[in-house]
A protein has these predicted regions:
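Conserved catalytic cores of very large enzyme subunits
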Residues: 1-166
Length: 166
């Protein structure tokens, strides 16, 4: 309220694939599965195409297509800028680069076009960074390292380690 006419300083963490910690979680609204009590033949057919026999078996892993649509819309708007073509300064997106990052994904060119043209995004690299080498030269998980499913970035310096919050 005291920064009249200015965008609030905000950050969003963006995943390109459904994060491991959310893949098997069901989407909930009002304390129940998002599709509880819904009977719709078209939705059921879509759910079956995605590997679920019932609507209430759907988990976040079944919604990669929707994730792609959201990421696409976000980066199209972010890259286009405001009505005068000026870039948006906020929110600042932090994109998690994980070992399962889809480098050939449909939106990757849009992400990197934005990075080259505007430089909006921060990239949080989790490829190999959560491992260490033991005395036998083997790559093993480093328990002290940030884990992709336990960290949310808050701009350039602050990272929330969810393991410390729980």
């Amino acid at each position: 309220p005291s920064r009249w006419g200015q965008s609030p300083f905000t950050n969003v963490t963006i995943d390109w694939t459904v994060p491991r910690d959310l893949r098997d979680q069901a989407p909930f609204s009002g304390g129940e599965h998002l599709f509880e009590g819904i009977e719709d033949a078209n939705l059921l057919a879509l759910a079956r195409e995605r590997g679920a026999n019932k609507l209430t078996e759907l988990t976040y892993k079944h919604f990669q297509k929707e994730m792609n649509l959201i990421n696409k819309a976000f980066y199209e708007v972010l890259t286009e800028g405001d009505s005068t073509g000026q870039p948006f300064t906020f929110p600042i997106p932090t994109v998690n680069i994980t070992e399962d990052f889809d480098w050939e994904g449909e939106n990757v060119p849009l992400l990197f076009e934005n990075a080259a043209k505007i430089g909006s995004s921060y990239f949080q690299n989790f490829i190999g960074s959560q491992y260490t080498v033991n005395q036998h030269g083997e790559r093993v998980p480093d328990e002290r390292a940030y884990k992709p499913d336990a960290v949310r970035s808050m701009c350039c310096r602050l990272q929330l380690d969810l393991r410390e919050l729980l």
